[in-house]
């Protein structure tokens, strides 16, 4: 099946859903739709430096340490390893009907936030403060996770896109007002 056929098939499937069924698929813990033969799927998995949680996997250095090497090829290679391990875990677990959190093929990785404020407790997840390096390593990791073939090995979901450097405890209500210059210079 090529991309055009896959898109057509997906559109036909969604057309068979009612509004509530379609809306439920937008949550990270999408329920099964038995009448359409769609199994449940949990979109929440992480692979910031290897596949996180749900069993054993290779753990690589944190992204900030990988960035210190300035090696796009190695970062892509680590993404390839993570997606291979993630796919193997997914295949084994889904055959047993285990589709819980941290067991899917959608990885909330990489973290492409530009690390500007050292008070943010998650800076180690990023590629640092340089927008160019963050861009290049983020793209390399995504290429590694998703693969270069006709079909995706896994789905990368870049997170914490812009102006997300904390403080972490207040992230859901902290009201930041960066200047247009700062946004253009460092974030987009």
Sequence positions of predicted segments:
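Glycoside hydrolase catalytic-domain context in secreted enzymes
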Residues: 1-187
């Amino acid at each position: 099946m090529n991309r055009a056929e896959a898109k057509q098939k997906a559109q036909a499937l969604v057309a068979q859903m009612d509004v509530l069924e379609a809306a439920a698929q937008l949550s990270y813990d999408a329920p099964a739709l038995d009448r359409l033969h769609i199994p449940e799927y949990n979109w929440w998995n992480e692979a910031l430096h290897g596949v996180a949680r749900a069993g054993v996997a290779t753990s690589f250095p944190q992204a900030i340490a990988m960035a210190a090497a300035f090696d796009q090829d190695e970062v892509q290679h680590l993404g390839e390893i993570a997606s291979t391990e993630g796919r193997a875990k997914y295949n084994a677990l889904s055959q047993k009907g285990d589709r819980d959190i941290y067991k899917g093929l959608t990885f909330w990785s990489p973290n492409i936030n530009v690390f500007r404020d050292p008070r943010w407790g998650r800076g180690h997840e990023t590629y640092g403060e340089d927008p160019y390096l963050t861009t290049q390593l983020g793209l390399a990791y995504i290429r590694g996770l998703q693969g270069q073939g006709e079909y995706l090995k896994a789905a990368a979901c870049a997170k914490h896109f812009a102006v997300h450097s904390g403080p972490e405890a207040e992230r859901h209500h902290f009201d930041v007002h960066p200047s247009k210059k700062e946004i253009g210079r460092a974030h987009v």
